[in-house]
Design a protein with these regions (language model features):
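Short, small-residue-biased leader/transition segments that mark boundaries at the very start
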Residues: 1-8
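Glycine-rich, basic loop-to-helix element that forms the pyrophosphate-binding segment
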Residues: 3, 71-87
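Short, well-formed alpha-helical segments that are part of the catalytic scaffolds
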Residues: 18-32
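A conserved acidic beta->alpha catalytic loop
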Residues: 29, 44-53, 96
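Short aromatic/hydrophobic "clamp" motif used to bind/position activated sugar donors
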Residues: 92
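Conserved donor NDP-sugar-binding/catalytic core segment of glycosyltransferases
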Residues: 104-139
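Conserved nucleotide-sugar donor-binding catalytic segment
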Residues: 135-220
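Catalytic core of nucleotide-sugar-dependent glycosyltransferases
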Residues: 209-211, 221-247
Length: 309
């Protein structure tokens, strides 16, 4: 039936890792969606709790369509790749397992999507994230709709706050995360910035996604994560340094590159090759100072341009 084939057009994707006591909120919010035609794809990133029992019980309830995929522990970015490769539909909505959606979340996405659906300049739509009390994560904004690239929105206009990304699956298939063996943390900005160079997004100022975390302060684990996966961090910052962005943001990217480069086992000449000799001469000493401070306290609050997690 056309209704059945229509289900696959929209997919809510959730990577899970040992969050069995939290995923119930998200499940309940999916059950109460005003718009019913969607599939929930869950990729389990090698959980050690029995979250699969919970998901099987959801599947047995048979109230929404759920696809459950297991993978060896490889990090959220590999779970996203896996989800994208399994997704049959045209829209891919990334929702973390400890977050949940407003009742009309998918309905509003589908509403705004119709305006860019057949426009190849657009990679997708973005609604706003808010705290459980309804306040926006970041400053409130006054505009209703913005058509802009992610790089313009986030780095150049510097619009603070968190957005909920919904991408055309066909675009994401061309922008899978790189696979760097042995590293399990890659900020989503790697892919967001690459897409942002070539596509626009439709940003709509409606709260569609409820998150519980504090978005501002760089968490301790964020620094640790980048120290443990330095080659991903270096790739993000070297690409950021070459973007057409304000000078100060470029400088920050260069410093951050050399801040995490000492954690990488790459030969120095390869580190220099990735970002250029002048960057090495000018920014390596400053970056190295940050690295020494990171090593000392594993945490330093430099306002960081890029992904917050």
């Amino acid at each position: 039936s056309s209704a059945a084939s229509d289900v696959y057009k929209r997919q809510v994707f959730t990577p899970v890792y040992n969050r069995k006591n939290l995923i119930g909120n998200l499940y309940q919010s999916l059950l109460s969606q005003t718009y019913k035609n969607f599939e929930w794809i869950i990729v389990d990133d090698g959980s050690t709790d029995d979250i699969d029992e919970i998901i099987k019980s959801y599947q047995n309830e048979d109230r929404i369509l759920i696809r459950f995929i297991k993978q060896e522990n490889g990090g959220k970015h590999r779970a996203i790749n896996n989800g994208v490769l399994h997704a049959k539909g045209e829209l891919f909505y990334i929702v973390d397992s400890d977050d949940y959606l407003t009742k009309d979340s998918i309905e509003r996405i589908v509403f705004h999507y119709q305006y860019i659906k057949n426009n190849d300049k657009f990679a997708g739509v973005c609604g706003m994230k808010c705290f459980p009390d309804g306040s926006r994560i970041g400053k409130e904004v006054t505009w209703k709709i913005l058509k802009d690239s992610w790089i313009n929105y986030w780095i150049i206009k510097n619009i603070k706050g968190d957005v909920a990304f919904v991408f055309k699956t066909s675009v994401l298939r061309n922008y899978l995360f790189d696979d760097i063996p042995g590293e399990k943390f890659c900020a989503e900005s790697l892919v967001l910035n690459r897409i942002g160079k070539n596509y626009l997004m439709l940003f709509f100022n409606e709260k569609i996604y409820i998150a519980e975390y504090l978005s501002d302060g760089l968490s301790v684990s964020s620094i640790k994560n980048r120290m443990n996966s330095p080659n991903y961090a270096m790739r993000i910052y070297s690409e950021m340094a070459s973007l057409d962005i304000p000078y100060l943001k470029k400088i920050k990217a260069h410093i951050n590159y050399w801040r995490f480069a000492p954690c990488s086992k790459l030969k120095m000449k390869n580190k220099i090759k990735q970002i250029g000799i002048s960057s090495y001469i000018i920014f390596m000493p400053i970056g190295y100072l940050f690295h020494m401070k990171d090593k000392k306290n594993n945490y330093i609050d430099i306002r960081h341009v890029g992904s917050k997690r």
